[in-house]
Amino acid sequence: MLGIPGPPTPPYTITGKLERAPGLWKFVQSKWRVGESDLTGEVTIDERQKPEFLTARLVSQKLVFEDLAPLVGAAPTRKTNVSAKQAQTQQQLEASGDLFPNVPLNIEKLRAMNMDVTLDAKKVIAPPWLPVQAMDFRVVILNGVATVKPLTMSVFGGGTIQGELIMDARTDTPKVRANLRAGEIELKNFFRESRYFDATQGKIQGHLALAGTGRSLAQVMGTANGHVALALGGGSISSLMVSLGGLQIFDALVLYVTGDNRIPIKCAMGRLNFQNGTVTFDRTLLDTQKSVLYVQGHASLQSQAVKAEVDARRKGFDLLDLHGTVRIEGKLRNPQVGLGRVFPLPTPVIGTAKDVACADLTQQLLAAP
């Protein structure tokens, strides 16, 4: 109605006071309800500048992460407040097994108006696999280039994710760049509302530096270059995650399980290198009491498929060596896990693997460009 470029949203209601002065619109005392999220604040549109300039200072007492899903073409998983187009997108993703939606983004809106918008979300309601509890950011759009900086997300347990996002939409094929760092994030919070929560412990550090091009999230990830690095200095994971693959896989990985279904972890780390949408596992390992697990392989973000192997190297004496690897293949959304060729040898095996120098390797992994 006012010609303001904005993102697609779930159903919304807005109340407030609209003020008009020569060349200036002000929307004050505003209250917004977007999907299940709320916003309050002040919006100003200055028509005297060319292009027009929008300034907004917004606060949310409750921000439901799924209400941001339309920004990347995704659909909320909830059953209410979902448009027919969003529901169709979700059905297509589930049917194809794809991880990223290929819904074109309306980038032309970024060129229509310059903006300076801040949002302080006091409470974030996120999916169980994303342990964000609050966030604040500033979005500045100048001549088709959108910069989200600073971006800060507070995580359950005291951890944070900080960094910046940039989208250059001056051309028809936008360029997207992200640089984020994560620190002191409790691993178990990624498994909220699951049976793995109680047996999972440890704190994660990480760094994400990715750049890609495209008009949809699937296209951007399918052309991405850069890396994602993660490290866990110690803790435990639930043995139930591994047991889903069957007893043979459990034996092949040579894992020690405590009485409360924990697998003690001395160290874990991994680096995913992205090159034109192809992801390669680099220095990806899990150091446990009885063995060191090494992951090798690759994934394609164009076909959204993965093919990887996990090889266990024993640290000590064992009566049986399965001489096999665990294979992970299929769509990223739902891969299959199974054993490669296995040759049981009924002879004692003396393992030679050593503990990983966790602190030094973690420093190298997260410091690398």
Give residue ranges: language-model regions.
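Short sequence motifs at beta-strands and strand-loop junctions characteristic
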Residues: 8, 129, 200-202, 262-265, ...
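Solvent-exposed, glycine/polar-rich loop segments of beta-barrel outer-membrane systems
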Residues: 242-255
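Outer-membrane beta-barrel architecture
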Residues: 53-55, 112-116, 175-177, 221-227, ...
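Outer-membrane beta-barrel and related beta-rich outer-membrane complex signature
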Residues: 68-72, 236-245
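Extended terminal
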Residues: 17-23, 30-33, 37-50, 56, ...
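Acidic, Ser/Thr- and Pro/Gly-rich intrinsically disordered regions
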Residues: 1-106, 122, 130-177, 181-199, ...
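Interface/linker segment at the passenger-translocator junction
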Residues: 77-111, 120-124, 341-369
